[in-house]
Amino acid sequence: MEQSSQNWFSSVETPIKVTGRDAVSWDESRDLVVVGFGGAGVATALQSLDNGLSVIALDKFAGGGATTINGAVVYAGGGTSVQKEAEIADTADNMFNYLKQEAEDIVSDETLRDFCDTSPEMIDWLQDKGVKFGSTVWHKKTSYPGPEYFVYHSDNSLATSYKKHATPAARGHRGYVPIEEGRKATNLGYSIFNPLKQSALDKGLQLETYHEVRQLVVDDNQEIIGVMALYFDNEKLLKKYQKLKQRAERLLMILPPILPGYNFFAKRAMAVLEKAKALEAQRSQKMIEAKKGVMLSAG
């Protein structure tokens, strides 16, 4: 589909085509450019920094994405350090036997096995970067436990049909937050995201917020060599834009969509967002070279 099509509803634009790297006057240059700095983006940035790459991360807004507004839940098992502390018996084989019933042939056994085998390592990796988990257990099936509990049965392993082939184990891991704060169950993802972000910054990450990427830059060989980002180079305009976005977010969070009255606040939020959108036309362009690659993790 061409961008000129009446059915093109995305803000993404066709790539900027150049003859080569030397044909561009780059404003920034890094080994890796990460587009979208939420959970996937920060994990990619951290791993790349650990591997010795220079990294710049760009986010259209303040960063964090859906990761920061969720309940801070990580699904993990196979004998994680948190499970062991909570005296929950689980192994990678047991986790595989359960998930194989759920996934059937949707993913290959090799991929599923790798997920189960490396699950404890993932929790260790998160903890090494500063993420803290609680170990109090809610022993029944639930979509989300009370604020006092940090490990719970987030899957269906307690169901009779699944217990025939695998021993039930609590695998929902919640990032630790104070109990009173945990009562709201949303906007708790900072307990996972913030430590990862700080770790990445400490390792040398260059983070640029309120930088929207709509176009890749490609050369004659169709190799992706960078991105073009839109940003506010006027501090006053940026602050005005941020205030409008924050106001709209507050309006949208007043009520969940399923409750009466949500549409009233949603319409007010949309009106505020239109004002913010009008400011976007005053942004400037920034050309950023990616010497080794571009990671798209923008949701």
Predicted regions and their residues:
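Conserved redox-cofactor binding core of oxidoreductases
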Residues: 11-14, 116-284, 291
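Glycine-rich active-site loop/strand segments that organize a redox cofactor
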Residues: 75-115, 127
